[in-house]
Amino acid sequence: MPQLNPNPWFYIMLMSWLTFSLIIQPKLLSFTSANPPSNKTSTTTRTLPWTWPWT
């Protein structure tokens, strides 16, 4: 069964992960986020239940 021979598949997997790790990932991490995280604490709004007119 040729698909169990790890010789070409391991090389392909290794090259694709190296390409991702060394080339693509630093380019993606250099972008600035559109919504940077803030230090503000989130406030919860109190919502009151609305009475339905037909009940």
From Swiss-Prot:
Subcellular location: Mitochondrion membrane
Biased composition (Low complexity): 41-55
GO cellular component terms listed in the entry, alphabetical order: mitochondrial membrane; proton-transporting ATP synthase complex
Membrane topology, record value: Single-pass membrane protein
Transmembrane region(s): 7-24
UniProt keyword Transmembrane helix, yes or no: yes
InterPro entries for this protein: ATP8_metazoa (IPR001421), ATPase_protein_8 (IPR050635)
Keywords per UniProt: ATP synthesis, CF(0), Hydrogen ion transport, Ion transport, Membrane, Mitochondrion, Transmembrane, Transmembrane helix, Transport
Molecular functions (GO terms): proton transmembrane transporter activity
Chief place of localization: mitochondrion
Assembly and binders: Component of the ATP synthase complex composed at least of ATP5F1A/subunit alpha, ATP5F1B/subunit beta, ATP5MC1/subunit c (homooctomer), MT-ATP6/subunit a, MT-ATP8/subunit 8, ATP5ME/subunit e, ATP5MF/subunit f, ATP5MG/subunit g, ATP5MK/subunit k, ATP5MJ/subunit j, ATP5F1C/subunit gamma, ATP5F1D/subunit delta, ATP5F1E/subunit epsilon, ATP5PF/subunit F6, ATP5PB/subunit b, ATP5PD/subunit d, ATP5PO/subunit OSCP.
Function: Subunit 8, of the mitochondrial membrane ATP synthase complex (F(1)F(0) ATP synthase or Complex V) that produces ATP from ADP in the presence of a proton gradient across the membrane which is generated by electron transport complexes of the respiratory chain. ATP synthase complex consist of a soluble F(1) head domain - the catalytic core - and a membrane F(1) domain - the membrane proton channel. These two domains are linked by a central stalk rotating inside the F(1) region and a stationary peripheral stalk.
Protein name: ATP synthase F(0) complex subunit 8
UniProt organism field: Corythaixoides concolor
